[in-house]
Amino acid sequence: MRKTVLIVKSALEQFRIPFYSRLAKAFESDGVDLRVLVPPDALAKHQPLPEESPAGLFVPVGTRRFQFGARRLTYQRIGRSADSADLVIVQQSAAELTNYLLFARRTWKRYRLAFWGHGHNFQESLRSRPGECLKKSLSKRVDYWFAYNHVSADIVRRLPYPAERICVVNNSIDTEGARAQWNSITPQETAETRRSLGIPADHPVVVYCGAFYKAKMLDFLVESVTRARRTQPLHLVVIGDGPGNRILLDFEKQNAEWVHLVGARYGRDKARYFRLANLCLLPGAVGLAIVDAMAYETPLLTTRSRDHGPEIGYLEQGENGWMTDCSIEDYADAIGLLLRDHDTRGRLAQGCRRTATQITLANMVERFRQGVRSALQMPPLGISAEADAAFCEQQ
């Protein structure tokens, strides 16, 4: 008998679409039907979907959002869809009101309920004690866990939670595709990109790639790069956008000769700018952008910020990236050191290449697939296999 697995998401990120599509195809031979339930407006933003996305994979469900000060809550009407599912995977979040309904309904519907998430809120500035306490309590009651990587898995184990019910996903993007795009950029294209930005051929380039908000430490970035440029004729290329863009817009206006904001870029267009870069600067809140840097063989320089996501666990100091204290002086010195030291930078680039071949989308799909198999085979948490089998026979 075929099994049905639901993934419930209150957002649909562009970089996740290839993952869901490949996971659905991998499930075909396992007798598993995958459905990803998302808000209609989130799905509409990505139309038309890529050809590789199977028909019916993404299902729009009614969604309501509530704002209470800085707190945003989401409710998705998925009750009956879950009733016929064998496994429901939801975000580990106290702000997803749907989760509470799913916890209540599984008492008599007996679908397995799994969390997919970080383990806790890694951004200290956004962490609330009541929210984290509630999240911790719920995290110990799901039937299975899909942890972003080993950092998240360690947090979940310490809740405590049974290690045999945790799948370490190794959160990633399509690194193979990103590397293919990066490798396809010709020297002529790179030279033309330099010319279009007014960057001399012998001037080093550092790139920032990510969103613009407080935890990204944009003020810190501006001051550090300004300090580093006193000893290096470097140029800063900024890829991204967000609510904190005023800081960088003003910075570019004052330093138009060497600061270049190019906006949000994707795919091969983004790879084109990384081809210029000697270093990737992300002083605060490192997330999946570290995987971009690895795929593009561009060593990441960051700090010991308390706002990093679990993906910071992919960084190996002195092997594939570099981390300093949260000091503008230390960070600026590290920029200068790594731009001057070609041997160290070359070694870090090799480490990036090695890591990029391990943290791949294909591996993430296979890990998630194996995790779903395990979750479907295990009885619900706290229920014996015999009792679970007896319940299933009655349905």
Where are these regions (language model features)?
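Conserved donor-binding/catalytic core segment of Leloir-type glycosyltransferases
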Residues: 6, 188, 194, 199-216, ...
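Acidic donor-binding loop of glycosyltransferase active sites
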Residues: 275-285, 298-299
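Conserved acidic donor-binding segment of nucleotide-sugar-dependent glycosyltransferases
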Residues: 303, 317-328, 337-343
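Nucleotide-activated donor-binding/catalytic signature segment of Leloir-type glycosyltransferases, i.e.
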Residues: 246-268
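Short hydrophobic beta-strand element within catalytic cores of glycosyltransferases
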Residues: 299-308
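Donor nucleotide-sugar binding/catalytic pocket of nucleotide-sugar-dependent glycosyltransferases
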Residues: 140-192, 382
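A short, well-ordered alpha-helix in the C-terminal region of glycosyltransferases
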Residues: 195, 337, 344-358
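A short, histidine- and acid-enriched strand-loop-helix "catalytic/donor-clamping" loop
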Residues: 97, 111-129, 141-144
